[in-house]
């Protein structure tokens, strides 16, 4: 299954708020939400919706998500927490959480177009796994800095998670530590995703 490129607001109406997918919000009084919420929810449907939330928020394919669940299952700690830590430590998500891009697909595009450096080296793989003490910067040219400058100016510094710090003057971000569960930017029950 390929990455979703269709209408984003339809997914938000169906699954709820997905801040990584888009900044847009649906109009209130939507008939679509009422249509899908009527009646009793089945257990399978609840699990499927939680999995789809995770997939669409982080912009993953089905195969990528299964691979992350498999890696998290091998860990000795809680599978759900390890899964969220793996997804939150992806380079495209770190750039989004630092405020260098307005959405995760926008952050993925910055990485693919080689505007981002990790520890002084160009990285063009959005799924690159960041580690504590990694320094994320932009290229030293005006075009790269201009792309990031607009996003940083419009982002809210109060929403920056505790495991990240950013220097808005030099457009430099630092990963301080591994993420805690309470700082995940998405309301989700990760155990239902693992059970699915």
UniProtKB/Swiss-Prot annotation:
CDD domains, A to Z: S4 (cd00165)
PROSITE patterns in the record: RIBOSOMAL_S4, S4
Keywords from the UniProt entry: Chloroplast, Plastid, Ribonucleoprotein, Ribosomal protein, RNA-binding, rRNA-binding
Gene Ontology terms describing biological process: ribosomal small subunit biogenesis; translation
Pfam families: Ribosomal_S4, S4
Major subcellular site: plastid
Family note: Belongs to the universal ribosomal protein uS4 family.
Subunit text: Part of the 30S ribosomal subunit. Contacts protein S5. The interaction surface between S4 and S5 is involved in control of translational fidelity.
Protein name (Swiss-Prot/TrEMBL): Small ribosomal subunit protein uS4c
Organism listed in the record: Stipellula capensis
Lineage start: Eukaryota, Viridiplantae, Streptophyta, Embryophyta, Tracheophyta
